[in-house]
Amino acid sequence: MPLTWKDSGLRWYWVVVLVFLADQLSKQWVLANFDLFESVKLLPFFNFTYVRNYGAAFSFLSEAGGWQRWLFTLVAVGFSTLLTVWLRKQSASLWKLNLAYTLVIGGALGNLIDRLMHGFVVDFIDFYWGKSHYPAFNIADSAIFIGAVLIIWDSFFNSKSEQDKTEEVK
């Protein structure tokens, strides 16, 4: 029997909305208050620094000439659709997977909007040690990372009762 939205992982879709709004509001704040490459030191190891990312994680393919914008758009739409279908098919009680999928979807959609509106992703979270800087990122990237970690965690530490719930839904 198909699950209703209340019984399925779709019940967790509020996380998508929360991540998306936090990401977009933070990026709009950066765009309104920072010039490109402007930096504000917040802690001895942490800045807000406005940079543009034309690629993916760690600026992967950022110098590819523009076609990557559409590749990453297709990837974001594809993964968001796939994870939404999976949410629809699994029990709302599988909190780790539901939270993981919704974090990834919210992050993917946040970066997708940037790519479509600006042609780049707004990054601004800048951790560093001495003169070594970790690549700048944003709230969407953080959500995707945390979601991926939860998916991996769940795959290694999924309890027998949670596996049974997943099997019942299939």
Swiss-Prot record:
<keyword id="KW-0812">Transmembrane</keyword>
<comment type="pathway">
    <text>Protein modification; lipoprotein biosynthesis (signal peptide cleavage).</text>
</comment>
<comment type="function">
    <text>This protein specifically catalyzes the removal of signal peptides from prolipoproteins.</text>
</comment>
<dbReference type="GO" id="GO:0004190">
    <property type="term" value="F:aspartic-type endopeptidase activity"/>
</dbReference>
<keyword id="KW-1133">Transmembrane helix</keyword>
<dbReference type="GO" id="GO:0005886">
    <property type="term" value="C:plasma membrane"/>
</dbReference>
<keyword id="KW-0378">Hydrolase</keyword>
<feature type="active site">
    <location>
        <position position="123"/>
    </location>
</feature>
<feature type="transmembrane region" description="Helical">
    <location>
        <begin position="67"/>
        <end position="87"/>
    </location>
</feature>
<feature type="transmembrane region" description="Helical">
    <location>
        <begin position="137"/>
        <end position="157"/>
    </location>
</feature>
<dbReference type="Pfam" id="PF01252">
    <property type="entry name" value="Peptidase_A8"/>
</dbReference>
<keyword id="KW-1003">Cell membrane</keyword>
<dbReference type="InterPro" id="IPR001872">
    <property type="entry name" value="Peptidase_A8"/>
</dbReference>
<protein>
    <recommendedName>
        <fullName>Lipoprotein signal peptidase</fullName>
        <ecNumber>3.4.23.36</ecNumber>
    </recommendedName>
</protein>
<comment type="similarity">
    <text>Belongs to the peptidase A8 family.</text>
</comment>
<feature type="active site">
    <location>
        <position position="141"/>
    </location>
</feature>
<keyword id="KW-0472">Membrane</keyword>
<keyword id="KW-0997">Cell inner membrane</keyword>
<dbReference type="GO" id="GO:0006508">
    <property type="term" value="P:proteolysis"/>
</dbReference>
<keyword id="KW-0064">Aspartyl protease</keyword>
<keyword id="KW-0645">Protease</keyword>
<feature type="transmembrane region" description="Helical">
    <location>
        <begin position="93"/>
        <end position="113"/>
    </location>
</feature>
<feature type="transmembrane region" description="Helical">
    <location>
        <begin position="12"/>
        <end position="32"/>
    </location>
</feature>
